[in-house]
Amino acid sequence: LLALAPQGPVGVNLETVTDWHQQTPFVDAFKSSREWVSHQASPFSWGTGPAVITDEYGWPQSLQSNQWVESIVFADGSPNYPDGIYNIRYDGIGTVEPIAGGNGSLTILQQSQGHIKINLQVPSDGLFTIRITDIVQPIENIRVYLPGFDNSSRIFHPNFLRSLDPFDTIRFMNWGRTNDSPVINWYDATNFYNYTQATERGVHPLYMIDLCNKTRKNMWICVPHMADDLYVQYLGLLCRIALDPDLTVYLEYSNEVWNSQFQQAQYAQTQGLALGLHPQSWHAGWLYYSQRSVEVFNLFSSLYNQLGTRNLVRVLAGQSVNPWVNKQIMDWQNAYQSADAFAVAPYFGGGFGNLNTTPLAPTFSVPYLLSLCQINLVSNHTVYTRQNAANAQQRGLQLLAYE
C-alpha cells in the first residue's frame, strides 16, 4: 500500500489480539494469553474441569480437588516471540508452572514464590502455557515479560510500535472484536485490568487510546453493533478525556453491516424489520444501519465535543462493488448530512495467495508483485471506485478505503 500510494495518507488495521497471531503488541505476553481452560487432573480430560472461580478481573481464587487450570500464552511458535530469558511474575501463593509443548523447551533458571526465570526455546509447532495446580492464596497479576523487559513499566513492545511508523491512522476493528461482538453495555467490555485482553469482548478502549497517544496516530474505532446509548456516550467521554486532542477520531458503527456473514448484519435486518423500515430484510438492514450510525455519531459527539470542536470524522460505510446500496445508506433520512466520509473495502491482490499462485508467489520480486497489484486494482475497482467517489462527493463526503 505504501509503495502504491506513497503520497497519500495510509492507515493500518491491527490483527486481533490472540495467543496465535503474528503481532506481539505487549511486553507482557500474558496480556494476550488465551482464557483459562479448566482440566480434570485424573483421569485427565482436556477442558472438562469445573468452572474456574475468579475475581472480577479473571484471576483464579481457588481450585477444587483434582482440578487445575492453564492459559496458553502463545501457540504455534509465533515468530515474533523470541527465544531467550523470560521472567514470570505473579502475586499470591500457590503452584505456578511454565510449560513448553511441541518441539520447544524451557529451563528454569531461578524460582521463588512470585517469580520464575526461564530460558525458553519457543516451540514452532506447539504451545507455551502457564499452569496453576495449587492455590493457597489467590494467584493474581501474572506477567510474562519478554526477553529484556523484566518488571518493565512499558505496555507496548518497541518493535510493535516501530511497525506502525509508516502509517497515520490505526483502525481497531479487530482489537475491538467488532465482528459478531456480544457487547451491549459498557460493563460487558473487557475490563482494563482483566488478566487478558484476548477475549471475545475485545481490547479495552484505553489500550487503543494509549497506543494512539504513544505513536501519534489517528484512531479509527468501531462501535459494537448492539452497544447501547450509554456505551457510546462513555466511549465519547473516554476519548475526550484520554486521547490527545491533536489526534483525529474516525468513528464507525460496527463493521460491514451489509455483509450477511456477520451477526451485525443479521441484527440490523431484525431491527430494521421490527421498525418497519422496509419489507425486504436485507434492505431493512441497510436502512437500520444508516439511521443507527447517525444516532451513534450524535451520542458520541455529545460528550466528545462537549468542550469544543474536536477532530472527528463520522464514517458511513458500504460495499465497494455495489454503489447503489451505498446510495441507499447515505440517503436514508439524509444520513449523509450527519457524516463526514463514506468508506468501502476495495480489496485487490488477494488472488496471489490462492492455490494456483501460492507455489509461484515466493519467486515474485517486489516490483513485479506491486505491478500485478496495480493492474488488479485498476482492472477490478476503477469503475466502482469512481462511482463511489462521485456519489460521496455529490453528498459532500470524502471517500475512504478501510481495508
Locations of regions flagged by a protein language model:
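Non-catalytic accessory regions flanking glycosidase/transglycosidase catalytic cores in CAZymes
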Residues: 1-253, 258-402
